[in-house]
């Protein structure tokens, strides 16, 4: 049986290393974990969701695909109620502000034994800024297209280093070259220009700095 996995979730799976123990936060119907297990990629999966309905659906789906005994299910707000015996944590389909809240409430994740795979639906620059200011480093990030929209998936490690500049928060050097990168850059620039031009004197200084930095980068 084919597992109905979006391009976004497939991209997340692409960052999982063989044999890793995976925690899927906000698992929805559980397809990411099911895919990783049926493909022999993950060793085990922890699946959590804040709502009982999706979690019950994920349990049924795991039974349907024959991997129920390899997944532990947990009703949890973020990572508050999950076991800590995993290697990589996946958060997909949430806003950047929600991810910031989850990570802020889990200081125990700040260890080099954990990796994060994050896929934002919105407010990605906010998430990148938070990560870089709180000891996390984006090791790699990839742009993908799902339907009509462009998204990114980032692989994050615990490695305190210099905070990202405003321009890097919008278009980081960790982005991998692929067929969608140019379109993503144009989308970022257009969005920044809209913010700056519409707000004029009241424009967010961070956005102004980011746009100026990226334009200067074009000239080098």
What are these regions (language model features)?
Residues 19-28:
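Conserved class I S-adenosyl-L-methionine
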Residues 2-5, 80, 97-220:
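Class I S-adenosyl-L-methionine
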Residues 86-93:
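Short SAM/SAH-binding signature in class I
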Residues 30, 34:
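Glycine-rich SAM-binding Motif I of class I
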Residues 44-49:
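Conserved SAM-binding motif I beta-strand of class I
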Residues 3-19:
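Conserved alpha-helix/loop element of class I SAM-dependent methyltransferases that forms part
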Residues 51-53:
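Conserved SAM/SAH-binding beta-strand->alpha-helix loop
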Residues 56-84:
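S-adenosyl-L-methionine
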């Amino acid at each position: 049986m084919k597992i109905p996995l979006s391009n976004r979730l497939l991209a997340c799976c692409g960052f999982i290393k063989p044999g890793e123990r995976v925690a899927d936060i906000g698992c929805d119907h559980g397809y990411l974990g099911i895919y990783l297990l049926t493909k022999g990629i993950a060793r085990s999966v922890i699946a959590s969701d804040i709502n009982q309905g999706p979690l019950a659906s994920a349990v049924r789906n795991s039974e349907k695909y024959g991997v129920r005994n390899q997944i532990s299910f947990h009703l949890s707000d973020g990572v508050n109620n999950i076991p800590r015996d995993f290697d990589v944590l996946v958060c997909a389909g949430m806003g950047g502000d929600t991810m910031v809240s989850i990570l802020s409430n889990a200081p125990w994740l700040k260890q080099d034994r954990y990796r994060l795979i994050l896929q934002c639906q919105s407010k990605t620059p906010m998430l990148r800024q938070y990560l870089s200011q709180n000891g996390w480093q984006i090791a790699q990030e990839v742009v993908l297209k799902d339907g009509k929209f462009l998204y990114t998936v980032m692989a994050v490690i615990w490695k305190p280093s210099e905070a990202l500049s405003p321009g890097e928060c919008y278009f980081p050097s960790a982005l991998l070259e692929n067929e969608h990168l140019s379109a993503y850059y144009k989308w970022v620039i257009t969005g920044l220009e809209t913010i700056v031009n519409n707000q004029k004197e009241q424009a967010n200084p961070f956005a102004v700095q980011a746009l100026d930095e990226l334009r200067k980068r074009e000239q080098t």
